Regions:
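Gram-positive cell-envelope targeting signals
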Residues: 1-5, 9, 13, 20, ...
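Short, aromatic- and cysteine-enriched interfacial helices/patches
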Residues: 10, 42-43, 99
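Generic alpha-helical hydrophobic packing signal
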Residues: 15, 20, 103-106
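Heptad-repeat coiled-coil amphipathic alpha-helices that mediate oligomerization/assembly
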Residues: 17, 24, 31, 35, ...
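A general secondary-structure boundary signal
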Residues: 18, 38, 89-91
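Collagenous Gly-X-Y triple-helix signature in extracellular proteins
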Residues: 55-297
């Protein structure tokens, strides 16, 4: 009899435990439902939406690429994780003494390397702010010469044009050595400001000398569209390249208004689209020579 009572008591205890566990499970389920409902209310609340929006704006502001001066760009070039914060296609602006606000297109990121600078941006003017002849007529070359190293346009870029760049912006520019053709022979120039070559804007073949690999901006999308430019009045503009027409010493290559490659006599007035390299200000190294990275050539 006592054994049976003990068994009954044990069964009752187990039943109570099971009931309690079931009650606890129901309470947990109810709590979970309450938590889910509370979480849903929080997620749908206007306060949270405003907080998330504010946080997103703060992140975007922290990561924003400033469209300020070259000096500002150089100071902000390196991101939080050591990467270059700028991208091919970005527009950077600079106030020039002669032309006012000039917009520059990023055509290469970390392409033209420089000792002492972790990052660089290669930029080219978005529009032709002036028209110039390639070189002056002379007794030897009545229609001008297509020899870029000794050209009037190279002298203009590194003297009159360069002097119009604000000092703090000019200090960010790196002397860049670029391949060119001099009197039919392979040569190079080392300048702070320079003209792009036919090969650098994506042309090849048909007697075009290799004067540098295409910059990334000219290898994406429709290359002809990428090459098109306008002038200071918003009209379509043809502009000079530093590449000669190897079949005629009086003719230099240029990009026509439709983005194609043509040649004009060197004493013709064409648009000027300067290019240059901005070095990041993450180093105390002085402005020095940059070197085109071989990886994309």
């Amino acid at each position: 009899m006592e054994q049976r009572d003990e068994k009954n008591l044990g069964a009752e205890i187990l039943q109570r435990i099971a009931q309690q566990m079931n009650d606890i499970a129901e309470q947990i389920a109810a709590f979970a439902l309450d938590c889910a409902a509370a979480m849903r209310r929080v997620l749908e609340s206007e306060a949270l939406q405003e907080a998330l929006q504010a946080a997103l704006q703060e992140i975007q502001a922290d990561q924003a690429r400033p469209l300020g001066s070259f000096a500002e760009v150089a100071a902000h070039m390196e991101g939080a994780h050591g990467q270059n914060r700028y991208q091919v296609g970005d527009i950077i602006q600079m106030n020039h003494d002669d032309f006012g606000l000039i917009k520059w297109r990023v055509i290469g990121v970390d392409v033209d390397q420089a000792a002492g600078h972790r990052h660089t941006l290669t930029v080219a003017m978005e529009r032709a702010e002036t028209y110039r002849w390639f070189s002056e007529p002379s007794k030897e070359h009545p229609f001008g010469s297509n020899n870029y190293p000794g050209s009037a346009i190279r002298f203009y870029l590194n003297n009159e044009f360069f002097r119009g760049i604000p000092e703090e912006d000019a200090e960010t520019l790196l002397t860049t050595c670029r391949p060119c053709t001099e009197h039919g022979e392979a040569s190079s120039t080392c300048d702070l400001v320079w003209l792009l070559s036919a090969s650098e804007v994506g042309f090849e073949g048909n007697g075009i000398p290799h004067e540098g690999a295409p910059y990334p901006w000219y290898t994406q999308g429709d290359s002809a569209e990428q090459r098109k430019a306008v002038d200071m009045d918003g009209d379509e503009a043809a502009y000079w390249l530093r590449t000669p027409n190897t079949g005629n010493g009086d003719y230099a290559r240029n990009v026509d208004t439709d983005g194609s490659l043509v040649s004009y006599s060197a004493n013709y007035s064409n648009g000027v689209l300067a290019a240059c390299v901005i070095g990041s200000s993450d180093s105390s190294a002085p402005v020095g020579a940059s070197e085109r990275r071989d990886a994309h050539e």
